[in-house]
Amino acid sequence: MPITQYKAAAVTSEPCWFDLEAGVQKTISFINEAGQAGSKLIAFPEVWIPGYPYWMWKVTYQQSLPLLKSYRENSLPVDSEEMRRIRRAARDNHIYVSMGFSEIDHATLYLSQVLISPTGDVLNHRRKIKPTHVEKLVYGDGDGDTFLSVVDTDLGRLGQLNCWENMNPFLKSLNIAMGEQIHIAAWPVYPGKETLKYPDPATNVAEPASDIVTPAYALETATWTLAPFQRLSVEGLKKNTPAGMEPETDPSTYNGHARIYRPDGSLVVKPDKDFDGLLYVDIDLNESHLTKALGDFASGHYMRPDLIRLLVDTRRKELVTEADPDGGVATYSTRERLGLNRPLDPPKDERHGIVGVAGQKSAEQRKAGDL
């Protein structure tokens, strides 16, 4: 049975723009802070490391290239020592960590999320299935084995989605069908509605994302919904402006948009415009009972699977495949290829690929204090 009552935290802060190492250090600092406050879960925004490339919405492709190069150089491989440091921080603080980051794998960037357990294991590694609009100039698509969201934990069934994925009715239905109880609606950095100059979809500014999309997700799914958001400063505006262009001067429109909602869609907490830090909430999973009693969609008593069904394909689609010795096709999962099934800190012999009796004996001797 999961723990039904616990504290959780959502990050509303400015990323360390174009600086992988500083971003890792700030991430670990927040994990330490949340752990010391007694939180069992901390949620970071979309592409928290190295920040959301919001400049791509404001400049031409040619103007963006120097920023794009620096952004790629500071993106985070999921199988890197930097990620292992973040995983160790989760383990040291006995806390679940939901973190969005720009993942670089081979030569492609992905809008990725990980869910790290209190033992430092990566329980889920997912990639946004379809980058939004101009994001396609920076990121690639997720695959069949990297898009599932909901994981069974001792805090309940916890799910994560990135930005406009939280509006996707198919992903929402899938999460409901998987029994999601706690949801991380990870958002990037958004301008306020006062910045609009032309007729534009309402969801292209922060207020609807914070005050319409996110509570609608909470209500429709009956989940505790944490919506971490990035922030911007005057210095951040300068860093995100190509050379030769005048940066914006007022960052306030980008700030104050993080939210936490109850399973009935009611607001728990939102920050002031100048707040930078952690928003806390005391979660009680039993609060979802009445919302679920009225509307258990997708997999429960308020749906008709004999009439409406969702087809899901979680297979990885390979560009290159190899024939196996039995005449079939050899395949592998993204998790396996990136080493996410291996222990965080395996014994030295295992890290060098040596597995056998000698290695087992050495481990036993180390445990006994002989080495």
UniProtKB/Swiss-Prot annotation:
Q: What induces it?
A: By cyanide.
Q: Name one GO molecular function term.
A: nitrilase activity
Please give the residue ranges the record annotates as the region Disordered. 339-371
Q: Which UniProt keywords apply?
A: Hydrolase, Lyase
Q: Which ranges are annotated Basic and acidic residues under compositional bias?
A: 339-353
Entry keyword annotation includes Membrane: no
What top-tier enzyme class does this entry carry? lyase
The entry's active site is: E46, K128, C163
Query: Which EC number(s) are documented for this chain?
Result: 4.2.1.66
Similarity remark = Belongs to the carbon-nitrogen hydrolase superfamily. Nitrilase family.
Give the record's subunit note. Oligomer of dimers, forming left-handed helical fibers.
Functional description taken from the UniProt entry? Catalyzes the hydration of cyanide to formamide. Degradation of cyanide may be important for plant pathogenic fungi in infection of cyanogenic plants. Also acts on 2-cyanopyridine, fumaronitrile and benzonitrile, albeit at a lower rate.
Name this protein carries in UniProt: Cyanide hydratase
Taxonomy of origin reads: Eukaryota, Fungi, Dikarya, Basidiomycota, Agaricomycotina
